[in-house]
Structure formats: structure tokens, C-alpha cells
Amino acid sequence: MDGKTVVIFLLLFLYGTEVMANIYNNPGNILLGENFAGETGKYYTGKKTGLRYSVFDSPEMGIRALYQDIRSKLRRSKGDVEDAMLRYLGGDNDKDSKKDRYKKASTHNEDVEGYIQRAIKAYEEEGEDGLVKQIIKNENKAEAQRYYLDNPQSITTGKKLAIMDLPSGTSFENAVKVYQQGEYGRKHGGRVMNDPNKNYNAQ
């Protein structure tokens, strides 16, 4: 039994076959067509929204995309978490009143006010890390939450990889190589952790 098979069996043991069948490595439900690195070209359709969301090649690349997306929206919103979250949830037309933006955000999301208030509190307590974790909680069912949040190394790695701008076709494997071989590791908190069952050929 090779290393990859061992990992699959471990994931199935921890999370069950039904959960693993619905893991798309997209903890933030990033829409198809955003062209983030790590996208596989495949997608899944939201049962309630009917929208198409990207499948990523690893949880790390999905988390990287979430960090990049949130950082972009926070910059555009000048640090206003409420405004950034409205953009994240689809109420991104600056010409609309705040009431209309909430209404648009509610088109494909439940309890938008509660969602945003939890996000604001998480950001106040833990900054962008808390915000990302809260989004993962809001966007996923309990079992899928565990898949991401019970693996802090994936979150740490995704965050580190998020400092790099990468072409949309870049895989997790190649993203790790770019990070390891450049100046990123020394400037931004050390090397990213490799999966011992994969060969990244990175020194």
C-alpha cells in the first residue's frame, strides 16, 4: 500500500465516505472562473444557490484562494470588514444602498446579518486568520469544517502560499516549489510543510 492510499484510507476513517465524496478543497466556496492557482477546471453546483464553484487540487490551494480573496476585498473596503463581507457574499455594487447590498447578498446566502456579525467578531479577535476560519465555519457543514479546521498545517501552508501571485494553472506541487526556491520562506515565516507522501523535489 503506497503513501497516497494510506492518506485516502485515513481521511475516509476520519470523515466518512459521504463527507469525502463532497470535499472539493474549496472551503470558501470560490466561484468558478475566478482563475485562482490550484483550480482543476472541474466544478460543483450549490444545491441551494445553483451557482458553480471551483474544485481545487488540494485543501491548501483552496485555503490560499480564500486568503487572497479576502485580502483583496479588505483592501478594496479599506479594512471595513462589514463592507468586505458584503462584497464576498455578492452585495458588491457600491452604487447600491447598504440595505440593497444586504438584500442582494441574501439572494444566495442565509442569515447574512448573522454571518457578517460573526465575521466581524472573529476579525476583531484574531485578524484575518479568525476571519478565514469563521468563513470556513459559515460556508461548510460540520463534517467539512473538521476536514479543514482540524488540519491547522493546511491553513498555515495555504496562508503562506497566499503571499505569492501565481498563474491559474499552478498546482499545489508547483506552488510549493516556487515558495521553497524563492525568497518567500526567509521573508515570510519559514518553509511550507510538505506532505511526506508526496515528492515535491524541493530543497
Predicted regions and their residues:
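Cell-wall polysaccharide-cleaving catalytic domain and substrate-binding groove, primarily
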Residues: 15-202
